[in-house]
Curated annotation (Swiss-Prot):
This is [LysW]-lysine/[LysW]-ornithine hydrolase. Transmembrane segments: none annotated. Pathway: Amino-acid biosynthesis; L-lysine biosynthesis via AAA pathway; L-lysine from L-alpha-aminoadipate (Thermus route): step 5/5; Amino-acid biosynthesis; L-arginine biosynthesis. Binds 2 Zn(2+) or Co(2+) ions per subunit. Its EC number is 3.5.1.130, 3.5.1.132. InterPro entries: ArgE/DapE_CS, Bact_exopeptidase_dim_dom, LysK, Peptidase_M20, Peptidase_M20_dimer, Peptidase_M20A. It is an enzyme of class 3 (hydrolase). It comes from Saccharolobus solfataricus (strain ATCC 35092 / DSM 1617 / JCM 11322 / P2) (Sulfolobus solfataricus). It catalyses: [amino-group carrier protein]-C-terminal-gamma-(L-lysyl)-L-glutamate + H2O = [amino-group carrier protein]-C-terminal-L-glutamate + L-lysine; [amino-group carrier protein]-C-terminal-gamma-(L-ornithyl)-L-glutamate + H2O = [amino-group carrier protein]-C-terminal-L-glutamate + L-ornithine. It holds the Pfam family M20_dimer. GO terms for molecular function: cobalt ion binding; hydrolase activity, acting on carbon-nitrogen (but not peptide) bonds, in linear amides; zinc ion binding. The active site is at D70, E122 (proton acceptor). One of its GO terms (cellular component) is cytoplasm. Belongs to the peptidase M20A family. LysK subfamily.
Length: 346
């Protein structure tokens, strides 16, 4: 057991430092092509590259371990200190991805066929997950790899609506203006704003506002973007109507939308992950997340799906991303034990 653990940790250190050294913000995933070509050869895993999104799939089989290769912007030089690995994506989600790759490799060596994907664009519009849907990929079971503290199993995510609002007004000289588009729309923003408070209450948050071209002229046009988050029990249509009614003089356009997801705690993937953790004397916790992930998209392939991964989720998108080799080992072991159980059901 000790020998296996040290093998996994050494391989994780090697692969994760290599992958962290490659800067892959959303839409730049092709930068990792040589990395995936090399590990495909070294680990004897068939490689498929999805052409529309530059997503990577390794291995074969009806079970998918799905993580993502893209990160948020801002490169962080990778380093290792006392078995802690630092770098952009160490937590979200190259650490979970490397855990999944190693698990896939070890399972493949045992004759258990499973696929692992480094999907593209999860941090933006999930074009990698959407390409799997568009091309009718079929999997019986899916585990999504996102940081969940190596103990938590995510069974629910909120949905999101990304809404552009374009408004027009009459430009006037600022010294004598009777109307001001910025002031008028600002009042409406305050009225429609819903601060993120708890999971079950929807949030409506302005994230971008642009208006005006001259110091002394009130704007003729104003652009506003709202980021809307809602749980599965909230009514999407009511949220859209509330905003539409508040901005009747403006043009509204949904530029991206991700549905909420909630899966049964009795589905086979959730159960297998829970048992895998218990076998390691780790108490599993079922949780719901306020954000979104590729699980929201991939639920269209199968409802036998859940999210789990190593890494402290509080460090996502921060400049302090770090993950321990022990966490990665727990992730590898959990994926392997869960899939060995699921494999028996196919």
């Amino acid at each position: 057991m000790l020998q296996e653990k040290e093998l996994v940790k050494q391989k994780a250190k090697e692969l994760l430092l290599d992958l962290l050294s490659i800067y892959t913000p959303s839409k730049s995933e092709a930068n990792a092509t040589k990395f995936f070509e090399k590990i495909s050869k070294d680990l004897n895993l068939k490689l498929e590259i999805l052409p529309d999104s530059n997503s990577f799939i390794l291995g074969e089989g009806d079970i998918l371990l799905a993580s993502h290769v893209d990160t948020v912007y801002g490169y962080i030089e990778p380093k290792i200190e006392n078995e802690l690995i630092y770098g952009r994506g160490a937590v979200d989600a190259k650490g979970p991805l490397i855990s999944m790759i190693i698990a896939t490799w070890l399972l493949n060596e045992k004759g258990i066929k499973v696929r692992v994907s480094g999907l593209a664009d999860e941090e933006s519009t999930s074009i990698g997950a959407k390409e799997l849907i568009a091309k009718n990929y079929n999997f019986k079971y899916i585990i999504v790899g996102e940081p969940s503290n190596a103990t938590d199993i995510v069974v629910e995510y909120r949905g999101s609506i990304q809404l552009d609002i374009m408004c027009e007004g009459t430009p006037e000289h600022s010294s004598s203006a009777k109307n001001n588009l910025i002031v008028d729309i600002s009042k409406k923003i305050i009225e429609v704003y819903k601060q993120p408070e708890n999971y079950d209450k929807p949030s409506i948050v302005p994230t971008i506002i642009r208006a005006g071209e001259s110091y002394n002229v009130t704007p003729a046009k104003l652009y506003l973007h709202l980021d809307i988050r809602y749980a599965i029990n909230n009514k999407r249509e009511d949220l859209i109507k509330e905003i539409t009614d508040k901005f009747p003089e403006c043009n509204l356009k949904i530029v991206d939308e991700t549905p909420p997801v909630k899966v049964s705690i009795n589905n086979p993937v959730v159960k297998s992950l829970a048992r895998a953790l218990l076998k390691q004397n780790i108490k599993p916790r079922l949780v719901k997340k306020a954000g979104t992930s590729d699980m929201n998209i991939l639920q269209r392939i199968t409802t036998n799906i859940a999210t789990y991964g190593p890494g402290n989720s509080m460090l996502e998108h921060t400049t302090q991303e770090k993950i321990s080799l022990d966490e990665i080992y727990i992730g590898v072991k959990t994926y392997m034990l869960a899939i060995e159980e699921l494999w028996q059901k196919i």
